[in-house]
Regions:
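Conserved active-site and cofactor/substrate-binding residues in soluble primary-metabolism enzymes
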Residues: 2, 22-26, 64, 81, ...
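Divalent metal-dependent catalytic cores for phosphoryl transfer on phosphate-bearing substrates
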Residues: 40-146, 156
Length: 199
């Protein structure tokens, strides 16, 4: 099994944009939270790695997203389950690999939603998710011009695949981001410096 330090170094080999690094760290934290709260605590490290590496190919191969990932992940001998999860998060958009495991379904569902949450958080006086309530997130979600690059349809399909309501997915994602926000911010600043704070 690849270790976290190796995975982070590999992520940074192919991703230089602060936004992409922040997003990867965020998904890592969220996926660890989901594992620990959904009955998969013994797999938390693996779920987190899938979150960290899910967009490994996006920055340098945006037109071949999820297609180049297996090639890049092979460089660190990533296990097949990790490769499958990374490819499955783009199901129906840039991949025909279907998310089947609960971990893959959470990754698929939370990927786009975390983008909306972070965009909303950065507009708040606190610049934080700690004081963000569900009703505030729902308002931003309904405004399709806000964080327009984050697909509401994909998020809705993600909730459906998990067998939960959209509100429940939002609540779980908010909780996961509250749990990891401080650690993500600390590591992101260490990697990118304060200059990447508002990227």
């Amino acid at each position: 099994m690849i270790i976290r330090e190796q995975a982070l170094a590999h992520l940074m080999k192919y991703n230089k944009e602060p936004f992409h690094i922040e997003h990867a760290l965020t998904l890592e934290g969220c996926m660890r939270y989901f594992a620990e709260t959904e009955g998969y605590a013994d797999e938390a490290d693996f779920w987190a790695l899938c979150g960290l590496l899910h967009d490994i190919d996006f920055e340098i191969y945006p037109e071949q997203h999820c297609q180049k990932a297996p090639e890049l992940l092979a460089e660190i001998d990533a296990p097949e389950a990790l490769v499958h999860a990374v490819c499955a998060h783009g199901y129906g958009i840039c991949s025909d690999v279907e998310p089947t495991h609960p971990m893959e379904k959470y990754l698929f569902a939370a990927d786009e939603l975390t983008g909306i949450v972070w965009a909303a958080a950065k507009m708040r006086p606190s610049k934080s998710v700690q004081d963000m309530e569900l009703k505030s997130l729902k308002k931003k979600f309904k405004d399709k011009k806000f964080a327009a690059g984050c697909s509401r349809d994909v998020i809705a399909v993600g909730a459906e695949r998990l067998g939960i309501s959209l509100d429940e997915l939002m609540e779980k994602t908010l909780a996961s981001m509250r749990a990891c926000e401080e650690s993500v911010r600390t590591e992101f600043t260490a990697i990118c410096g304060n200059g990447g704070e508002n990227a």
